[in-house]
């Protein structure tokens, strides 16, 4: 594992709240920030690493253009999360009005275990309808 990858994982643990910020600031000045950013985006952890950098007051280590790009990316993650919240609330209300129970699975539900739920990137919304999927699909098609 490279030095940058080790620091990435340390930043991830800080962002998740499982590691207290330690004296890694001297190491941060030496990082290849473009590579850290690409790794974070590829792994879906860009907002979590951003949280760690904010906790460490380490933004000055990032080139300005990367800082702006990263901040914009975090805003996009938060916007998608809010949209998913609205969709999930609508689905939940719709199914409840038809007496169909819904269980939220994986991604979005797990976000509540994170220090900042809207910084947990989620793909789609996975739900279980307790064997009533076909009926639920038909109801949605009629709406």
Q: What feature does the model see in each segment?
A:
Residues 2-9, 17-106, 133:
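Helical scaffold of the NTase/Pol beta-like nucleotidyltransferase catalytic core
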Residues 104-116:
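Short, glycine/charge-rich beta-strand/loop segments that flank catalytic centers
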Residues 115-140:
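Catalytic metal-binding acidic patch
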Residues 94, 102, 115, 140-143:
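Catalytic domains that recognize anionic headgroups
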């Amino acid at each position: 594992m490279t030095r940058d990858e080790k620091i990435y994982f340390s930043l991830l643990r800080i962002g998740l709240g499982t590691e207290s910020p330690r004296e890694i600031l001297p190491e941060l000045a030496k990082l290849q920030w473009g590579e850290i950013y690409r790794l974070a985006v590829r792994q879906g952890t860009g907002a979590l690493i951003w949280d760690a950098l904010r906790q460490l007051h380490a933004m000055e280590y990032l080139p300005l253009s990367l800082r702006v790009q990263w901040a914009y990316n975090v805003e996009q993650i938060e916007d998608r999360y809010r949209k998913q919240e609205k969709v999930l609330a609508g689905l939940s209300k719709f199914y409840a009005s038809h007496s169909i129970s819904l269980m939220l699975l994986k991604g979005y539900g797990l976000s509540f275990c994170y220090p900042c739920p809207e910084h947990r990137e989620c793909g789609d919304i996975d739900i279980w309808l307790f064997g009533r999927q076909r009926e639920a699909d038909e109801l949605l098609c009629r709406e």
